[in-house]
Amino acid sequence: MSTLVSLPTAAPAPDYQSIDRPLHFSVAAAAKVRELIQEEGNADLALRVYIQGGGCSGFQYGFEFDENRAEDDLAVVTDGVTLLVDPLSLQYLMGAEVDYTESLTGAQFVIRNPNAKTTCGCGSSFSV
């Protein structure tokens, strides 16, 4: 005799486009990106943040300028400056903040990521 078991259906994947701010792009970071874009002389540039394998903790953050926005990219605009994130990277960055800090030890873009279980001392790699 066989018994049919009804399995629960998977919840639909969250639609990050409908979330108000899945990622925070600080005013300080936007100001620095604006300055760098002006130095490049190309007003069509946006800052792309992405995640890739590597680093001492398993994943690392990457930053690059990009003129092209893919249809499924998340675009966060702060003070007229655009930050782009692809959907695969966004799953690791949900709720994170992209900021820019200056201190006696130097200036850098910083990602404060609530999803990171551990980070390394350099601040550019993490694990989940």
Curated annotation (Swiss-Prot):
Keywords: Iron, Iron-sulfur, Metal-binding
Chain sites annotated for binding iron-sulfur cluster: C56, C120, C122
UniProt-listed InterPro entries: FeS_biogenesis (IPR000361), FeS_cluster_insertion (IPR016092), FeS_cluster_insertion_CS (IPR017870), FeS_cluster_insertion_RrpA (IPR023063), HesB-like_dom_sf (IPR035903)
Main function: Required for insertion of 4Fe-4S clusters for at least IspG.
Gene3D superfamilies (alphabetical): HesB-like domain
Subunit structure: Homodimer.
Signal peptide: none
GO CC, alphabetical: cytosol
Transmembrane segments: none
Species per Swiss-Prot/TrEMBL record: Xanthomonas oryzae pv. oryzae (strain KACC10331 / KXO85)
Any single biological process term in GO: iron-sulfur cluster assembly
Cofactor: iron-sulfur cluster
Cofactor remark: Binds 1 iron-sulfur cluster per subunit.
Stored PANTHER family: IRON-SULFUR CLUSTER ASSEMBLY 2 HOMOLOG, MITOCHONDRIAL
GO terms, molecular function: 2 iron, 2 sulfur cluster binding; 4 iron, 4 sulfur cluster binding; iron ion binding
Pfam families linked to this entry: Fe-S_biosyn
Membership in a protein family: Belongs to the HesB/IscA family.
Official protein name in the record: Iron-sulfur cluster insertion protein ErpA
